[in-house]
Amino acid sequence: MADYQRILSYLYRYEKSEKKECLGFIKAEQKSAILKLTIQINDERLLHGMELKLCFYEKQGEHWRVRKLDSIITEENKEEFHQMYSKEQLPEGFDIKKQSGVVLYYQEEYYYGS
């Protein structure tokens, strides 16, 4: 299990960079270059058909690098998302243990983040 890595983090709602309440969690597990994601969000503001842009971010020197992984189309205000990604579906050089967190954007100034 030496190649197994996991991130488990709460997801908070952000409005104009201000951290609000905790509304869910993300669990990301990577083993043998396969990434398994579990995301749960319970937010009454989450409407049917909203697009959430799923991005991971990491610190690289003085800068932050944001990598978009996927887009999620919501079905209801209690969203539960399970997905697996092969090495070919991941951004080049993606390594879960190097990631600092995750962001799910739905508008420029409104998002969920760890």
Regions found by a protein language model. Name each.
Residues 1-114:
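N-terminal targeting/export leaders
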